[in-house]
């Protein structure tokens, strides 16, 4: 795998890719790939040029993954942001990213306040009951035959910020080659395969949640269960209901789950990851 476009190409299109446990919505790899191609054409025909930055302020869900993969498919740079930021924080990160547009929900008041102050276009992400994502925003229209040229390994795919614990947060660019190398290594190390089901408990704006838990599973052709947030109370019921074989999290989450293990009648998983990537 050389770019994030390759993430979906090798996978059986009939295989289940993402399940949202809150409402039971499930999409396969074929649907995911088709949506990304269609929406990538829409983005590029809106007037954006390769290498420009698309900020993403969305909660965990199908919408987030489609938005992220769409941006990178269109040779744009995805810049994830914590969707719970206040308007002041959004404004700082949007300016620092030099974002050209923002993808968010219809009810994201703080990010919309920041975009108004910066005169940035907003694209609203939504989906229907079958998992089809729509991106509504300014610009032209296009069909899948207008799919833009694929990215190359040296293109920047992702902009993330350091935590800022020792000073001002700094933007950290990652190329398609950087991201795919990490994804391939993680999938190989944990021997992930289409037989696996992963439970995503980390936020997707976090490198660990996006790269370590999610993209690595998709590269392996595995299925992911994607709740909108981590819930210790819901963890083991989800594991049992969906035959989860692995998850990846920071140590704090492991500690929370271990503390509840006896009372929750905890089962065992085949694999688990402890290292945070960002």
Task: Annotate each PLM feature.
Residues 5-28:
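AMP-dependent adenylate-forming
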Residues 26-30, 157-181:
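Conserved AMP-binding A3 loop
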Residues 58, 79-94, 106-110, 222-242, ...:
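ATP-dependent adenylate-forming carboxylate-activation enzymes
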Residues 13-14, 129, 141-161, 168, ...:
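Conserved pre-ATP/AMP-binding loop-to-beta segment of ANL
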Residues 25, 41-88, 97:
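Conserved AMP-binding/adenylate-forming
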Residues 180-197, 205-245, 256, 260-265:
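Conserved AMP-binding/adenylation subdomain of ANL enzymes
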Residues 59, 104-110, 202, 230, ...:
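Adenylate-forming
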Residues 108-153, 260-263:
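ANL superfamily adenylate-forming
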